[in-house]
Amino acid sequence: MSNSTLNPQNSTLPPALIFDMDGVLVDNTPVQARAFQLLFRDLGLTTKALPLLKRLNGMPAGEIIQHVFRHPIPKKQLDSYAEQREFLYRTLYWDKRRALPGLVDFLKAARAEGHKIGLGTGSGGPTLSYILDHLDLRRYFDVVVGKDDVPRGKPHPDTYSRTAAKLGVAPENCIVFEDAVLGEQAAYRAGMRCVAVTTSLKAKDFQAPLTTINDFTTLTPAQLLEMLAQQPDVPQPQKRRG
């Protein structure tokens, strides 16, 4: 059963395209995991970061860190841990920042074909600049929404709902690009369809994406519209486990 239907034929404009950042614009999940692992080591924790990220990727860093402790950690302390992790991540990723193959051509084609384009991410301002401005990608986005712009992160729908509102597009006329299960669930809760980008997970890990891609070399905006016409229904979000 679906909770809404995407039907571009009912609109004079093509659907808006909303992108997550980490793992979608750039393939940085292994570096993110390495930064978490170094932080956990410094904190004397034995948690394995990569499996943790596969389960919780999409959440703000502070929320991910809280999950490794059995007791609540004061927000000020979590923020400090998140800043340490951010420093490690930037140091590790400094000379490795590259856009996902085909991304720029896809964004150019989407803009040329009249799609509004937004970015909805769990990252904050400095981290956004670290990727968007270094790679000169900000020019392609009409709207950018980060963790400081919404009260709740993914899997809550706030990030994508806010992005759609700022774009001036109804949720049912938005398609989200996500690499994380929690992000996919956020899209469905917002009433949107989702394209899964398999930089860090396998296609089978996602619930019901419109399609799955390894990068943007195998997809065009026109092909996306054809898929949408064949699969217009938005899946019901799965209930969270654990």
Language model features by range: what are they?
Residues 118-119, 196:
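Hydrophobic beta-strand core positions in alpha/beta domains
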Residues 2-3, 7-15, 108-111, 124-125, ...:
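Asp-based, Mg2+/Mn2+-dependent phosphohydrolase catalytic module
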